[in-house]
Amino acid sequence: AYNEAESFTTAGCTPEDVLQLMTTIDRRFMAGLAYFLGARKLRCGVIRVGNGIPELQWDTIRRIGPTGCIVVPSFLTKLVAYAEEHGIDYRRSSLRRAICIGEALRDTAFGNNTLGAKITELWPELELFSTYASTEMQTSITECGHHCGGHVPADLILVELLDEQNNPVAEGEEGEVVITTLGVRGMPLLRFRTGDICIGYTERCACGRGTMRLSSVIGRKGQMIKFKGTTLYPPALYDILENIPGVSNYIIEVFTGSLGTDQIVLRIGSARRDEAFEKEIKDTFRSKVRVAPEVVFEPVEYIAKKQMPQMSRKQIKFVDLREQTK
């Protein structure tokens, strides 16, 4: 409870706030219960609505008037779409802040990525707070109102950023997040390698906090792709695809080619399947990351099923087949 209460405080929440929990606390999602207990610890009001069902979310907002929500940010776009379809003036709703979980909102320069920019354009009155967490951390690293990286709670976790040789990286360089938990009794971790690649900043934040700040996750160490001499991480590819009009959904597949090198296939769900659109996609990739993967068009429904297999709680956008194709 304490860790999430501190996270909410960093995001500017006070006991005067009412938070709408737009995530489940069931289906083995432990963080959902932590959010609920954290809000109670802070003495906020908290409404357990659960995930999905835009109609129920908007009915709750109308009836109770929450000031903030805890939400997977891409769901906010669905809330907006439902509101527009049903004549709800969402920009004048009671919601003023969203504590966003599970998906990145920022680039490494603290600007909005594609998802963050899209939500902000649709709903400028809603302030977005990016978070970074994992089960092993047992805490959240959360932005303050200056949105210059997530603040590490120094009384709960020790964070190091290390290179391939286990040496600390220089300020502003990418490194693997290595954590040591503090005060955890059940499963304490000493220098646990998360596999996440971030950039750390130690300069004092404008909010007055002097603890380390972390960028959004650049990628997973195990998901690094070396394609035609260029180092890529899946989130960079997601950001490009989600900014191309006409791309409804997608799955990125990586496999080992006949020469032992990484190869990328973009399986794209779209109503368009013409050569001009394929060229547009490849040209966009060349302009952003200097290389163009293979493009394969698939039915939107096929990709949707692949993204959410049975019993899956998280959407799949990246499939690593390299071990199977070596």
Language model regions located:
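Conserved AMP-binding loop of ANL adenylate-forming enzymes
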Residues: 4-46
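Active-site glycine/GP-rich loop and adjacent strand/helix microenvironment
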Residues: 42-326
